């Protein structure tokens, strides 16, 4: 289901925390549709994206955009040489990007359908502001090890309050429980 969503969207957004912790590929792995992988958009306050990451190594002109607030000139040059589009943007309360402004800038770059694969904090912030049209909640039946550090999703109150239409999706492809919420 994730790869189908990636195929259907022309851009995909994550935070640098997700990128550095998970080292995702953020591509469409459906046979024959790989060329339709979305542009990768990363929110990275201080250009902390690891240069050993898959995203950095596979960046080329036009497929990777990073929003940042501040970084050394050396770091900026390194990223630009890889073909990464850097967009300098201010932070709200010196902590978060203005997501509405990020959306406007992404739109100006020709991106019309944005898939956000975010962790707890970013998802909750966007849900709170009612900026999603649709929200897919994937729930794995696997219990994560207590040895792993992770943040459990705690944005349910915003999800239930702001997104009244709810549909269970049965993909028959895996054991994940998927619920689609719409405004």
What residue ranges belong to the model's regions?
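Enzymes that bind and transform nitrogen-containing heteroaromatic metabolites
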Residues: 1-183
């Amino acid at each position: 289901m994730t790869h189908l969503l990636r195929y259907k969207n022309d851009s995909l957004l994550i935070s640098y925390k997700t990128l550095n912790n998970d080292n995702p590929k953020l591509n469409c792995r459906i046979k024959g549709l790989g060329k339709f992988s979305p542009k990768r958009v990363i929110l990275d306050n201080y250009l902390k994206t690891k240069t050993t990451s898959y995203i950095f190594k596979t960046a080329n002109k036009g497929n990777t955009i990073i929003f940042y607030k501040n970084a050394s000139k050396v770091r900026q040059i390194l990223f630009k040489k890889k073909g990464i589009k850097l967009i300098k943007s201010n932070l709200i309360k010196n902590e978060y990007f203005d997501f509405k402004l990020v959306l406007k800038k992404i739109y100006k770059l020709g991106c019309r359908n944005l898939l956000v694969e975010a962790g707890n904090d970013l998802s909750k912030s966007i849900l709170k502001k009612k900026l999603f049209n649709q929200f897919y909640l994937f729930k794995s039946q696997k219990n994560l090890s207590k040895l792993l550090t992770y943040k459990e999703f705690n944005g349910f109150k915003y999800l239930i309050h702001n997104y009244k239409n709810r549909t269970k999706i049965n993909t028959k492809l895996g054991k994940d429980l998927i619920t689609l919420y719409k405004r």
